[in-house]
Curated annotation (Swiss-Prot):
Function: Broad specificity cytosolic 5'-nucleotidase that catalyzes the dephosphorylation of 6-hydroxypurine nucleoside 5'-monophosphates. In addition, possesses a phosphotransferase activity by which it can transfer a phosphate from a donor nucleoside monophosphate to an acceptor nucleoside, preferably inosine, deoxyinosine and guanosine. Has the highest activities for IMP and GMP followed by dIMP, dGMP and XMP. Could also catalyze the transfer of phosphates from pyrimidine monophosphates but with lower efficiency.
Residues reported in the UniProt entry to bind ATP: R144, N154, Q453, R456
Family to which the UniProt record says this protein belongs: Belongs to the 5'(3')-deoxyribonucleotidase family.
UniProt keyword Ribosomal protein present: no
GO cellular component: cytosol
Subcellular location: Cytoplasm, Cytosol
Protein's recorded name: Cytosolic purine 5'-nucleotidase
Cofactor dependency: Mg(2+)
Cofactor note: Binds 1 Mg(2+) ion per subunit.
Length: 560
């Protein structure tokens, strides 16, 4: 007779006796199928699944799509007067990464941590460090809130732009026709600041996306530029069985229709053998021209789209939700009203950490799932180059050994220079495994600004939302403990606090004999007055009082 898990967990002490030690190891799915958790989320509480389209439902192939955007932007710059030589540049995917900051004053690309400390600094293709860096950044630090000067290149659409900025700065710095200055460059009596150059690039990128031929060239060759996954119809059909599904994209209807038709263009439906269905049938609500992040605030007028012409019908839509109708504009409040859902009922899935994740989290309280396509490469390096990580751990052990028997009375100064050089070399090798700018999430042991934003705003994240296919809709995504250094570096061994020298070490915060304390207080106060405060001391809670990030709703549990 087998024992159920619930029976075993009635008495925690019985669990090891009923299981072999191998069974106690936590089961984890394949790394490339995993969904990673920052804040616990119970899937059975999600009533609506929301999607962005670009780089979420429709993942653009890299580097083909970035190369196309890069070429079109360069052509636009040349058409407005930039040098013809720029047409010789080709997109190099090994250089840029997301989350870099462009300094519009000095023309530098910066990789920073959450607090603005510099991790990497590049002027064009030249990586600068040491005294050269301190001339422009005396404390190796930037004020991130100075948005007039510092621009964060956070999206996947920013990758071609990031590399183009490096190309331009390098060209104008090194081309003999131009005189390089600290804040720009000169051509005779003409001066161009890096700020002006940056604005030209921003305008060119916007022109390519909204007025140029980027979308036209994309739909002309969808197989070349868009990833098509046969598991997409299956996952969305399963989501629709347990809740409502909506699409909210900034793209217009004509482009959305062509992309989505391609993504769902299979001879069968959700499963082999089932009949083919149009892409619209997988959604309860379709909303285009969303204009995120404005969409998560005041939004825009909600209008109806004529799906035959792609044009908008006149007037504001004020009716109830109707299946088969495509809407334009609106706001996140509109979605909640039409679907009959409130903030935490909705899991919104997108790739844009600001436009999709931050705003939906801060303004609406929606649960958030961030799609990070680069995570596949990050996991590959993490697993394939494990020897580098292991060597760093070994070097830390060697370093600790040198100081093992030394305290403040020691005059001995161990020579750690060779270990330090090796640590720097191994750390550099590790960084270069990700690309010239290193990992999206860290430089050495320090986390990047992008990593801190992911941890702060994304409840869940993965390389692809398709990974949800490998979890049941009753799953509890439980966040792992985030350990501080005094927890991650100290073994779970007994320490006698009475032997510690700290004056607070013997302060017992776990239990107090309240009855004895009450008696003593009563002896002291009874002669003064028979009147006592209603409560002389707090009682130790007998039930759970702390929020443990288990996505629990106490009121709902009580109602049940």
């Amino acid at each position: 007779m087998t024992t159920s898990w619930s029976d075993r967990l009635q008495n925690a002490a019985d669990v090891p006796a009923n299981m072999d030690k191998h069974a106690l190891k936590k089961y984890r799915r394949e790394a490339y199928h995993r969904v990673f958790v920052n804040r616990s989320l119970a899937m059975e509480k999600i009533k609506c699944f929301g999607f962005d389209m670009d780089y979420t439902l429709a993942v653009y192939k890299s580097p083909e799509y970035e190369s196309l955007g890069f070429e079109l932007t360069v052509e636009r710059l040349v058409s407005i007067g930039y040098p013809q030589e720029l047409l010789s540049f080709a997109y190099d995917s090994t250089f840029p990464t997301r989350g870099l900051v462009f300094d519009t004053l000095y023309g530098n690309l910066l990789k920073v941590d959450a607090y603005g400390n510099l991790l990497v600094c590049a002027h064009g293709f030249n990586f600068i460090r040491g005294p050269e860096t301190r001339e422009q950044y005396p404390n190796k630090f930037i004020q991130r809130d100075d948005t007039e000067r510092f621009y964060i290149l956070n999206t996947l659409f920013n990758l071609p732009e990031t590399y183009l900025l490096a190309c331009l700065v390098d060209f104008f710095t090194n081309c003999p026709r131009y005189t390089s200055c600290d804040t720009g460059f000169k051509d005779g009596d003409l001066f161009m600041s890096y700020r002006s150059m940056f604005q030209d690039v921003r305008d060119a990128v916007d022109w390519v996306h909204y007025k140029g031929s980027l979308k036209e060239k994309t739909v002309e060759n969808l197989e070349k530029y868009v990833v098509k996954d046969g598991k997409l119809p299956l996952l969305l059909s399963r989501m629709k069985e347990v809740g409502k599904v909506f699409l909210a994209t900034n793209s217009d209807y004509k482009y959305t229709d062509k992309i989505m038709t391609y993504l769902f263009d299979f001879p069968h439906g959700p499963k082999p053998g089932s009949s083919h269905r149009p892409w619209q049938s997988y959604f309860d609500l379709i909303l285009v021209d969303a204009r995120k992040p404005l969409f998560f605030g005041e939004g825009t007028v909600l209008r109806q789209v004529d799906t035959k012409t792609g044009k908008l019908k006149i007037g504001t839509y004020t009716g109830p939700l109707q299946h088969g109708i495509v809407y334009s504009g609106g706001s996140s409040d509109t979605i909640c009203d039409l679907l009959g859902a409130k903030g935490k009922d909705i899991l919104y899935i997108g790739d844009h950490i600001f436009g999709d994740i931050l705003k939906s989290k801060k303004r609406q309280g929606w649960r958030t799932f961030l799609v990070i396509p680069e995570l596949a490469q990050e996991l590959h390096v993490w697993t394939d180059k494990s020897s580098l990580f292991e060597e760093l751990q070994s070097l830390d052990i060697f370093l600790a050994e040198l100081y093992k028997h030394l305290d403040s009375s020691s005059n001995e100064r161990p020579d750690i220079s060779s270990i330090q050089r090796r640590i720097k070399k191994v750390t550099h090798d590790m960084d270069m495994c990700y690309g010239m700018m290193g990992s999206l999430f860290r430089s050495g042991s320090r986390q990047t600004l992008f990593a801190s934003q992911v941890m702060r705003y994304a409840d869940l994240y993965a390389a692809s939302f398709i990974n949800l296919l490998y979890y049941p809709f009753s799953y509890l995504f439980r966040a792992a403990h985030v350990l501080m250094p005094h927890e991650s570096t100290v073994e779970h061994t007994h320490v006698d606090i009475n032997e510690m020298e700290s004056p607070l070490a013997t302060r017992n915060r776990t239990s107090v004999d309240f009855k004895d304390t009450d008696y003593k207080r009563h002896q002291l106060t009874r002669s003064i007055s028979e009147i006592k405060p209603p409560n002389l001391f707090p009682l130790a809670p007998q039930e759970i009082t702390h929020c443990h990030d288990e996505d629990d709703d106490e009121e709902e549990e009580e109602e049940e």
